Swiss-Prot record:
The keyword Lipid metabolism does not apply. GO terms for molecular function: large ribosomal subunit rRNA binding; structural constituent of ribosome. Belongs to the universal ribosomal protein uL11 family. This is Large ribosomal subunit protein uL11. The keyword rRNA-binding applies. NCBIfam families: L11_bact. It comes from Nitrobacter hamburgensis (strain DSM 10229 / NCIMB 13809 / X14). Forms part of the ribosomal stalk which helps the ribosome interact with GTP-bound translation factors. The lineage of its organism: Bacteria, Pseudomonadati, Pseudomonadota, Alphaproteobacteria, Hyphomicrobiales. Part of the ribosomal stalk of the 50S ribosomal subunit. Interacts with L10 and the large rRNA to form the base of the stalk. L10 forms an elongated spine to which L12 dimers bind in a sequential fashion forming a multimeric L10(L12)X complex.
Length: 142
């Protein structure tokens, strides 16, 4: 018989840096989950990732206080900032340009994010990435 799901918890945790301090500890502790068990399992699964890459994670909480978690790909903004070699996006997107990304970089990001996006083709994913780039104040060059 399947376990009864009591809730979901979405967090964004740096790769290989999960520890019981806030925000992870209190979020898991309030729901009665074993914080160290999550931290060890998450850090073990993110060993091959670049250190401190933000990893979105969805934790499924069961009635017996056990849990499973699913890791997503890093946020699109993270990939765009890396590609443009900038620290943050533009304060006034549309007016000020924060940097520039090429179509090849956009395609690469779209292919990495494909499994988490709600689209079927790489071209559709590319248009989503381009939209995110524009909203960050990045220009998409040919």
């Amino acid at each position: 018989m399947a376990k009864k799901v009591t809730g979901y918890l979405k967090l964004q945790v740096p790769a290989g840096a999960a520890n019981p301090s806030p925000p992870i500890g209190p979020a898991l502790g309030q729901r009665g989950l074993n914080i160290m068990e999550f931290c060890k399992a998450f850090n073990a699964q993110t060993q091959k990732e670049e250190k401190n890459t933000p990893i979105p994670v969805v934790i499924t909480i069961y009635a017996d206080r056990s849990f499973t978690f699913e890791m997503k790909t890093p946020p699109m903004a993270y990939f765009l900032k890396q590609a443009a070699k900038i620290q943050s996006g533009s304060k006034a997107p549309g007016r000020d340009s924060a940097g520039q990304v090429t179509k090849a970089q956009v395609r690469e990001i779209a292919e990495k994010k494909m499994k988490d996006l709600n689209c079927d083709t790489v071209e559709a994913a590319m248009s989503m990435v381009e939209g995110s780039a524009r909203s960050m104040g990045l220009q998409v060059a040919e």
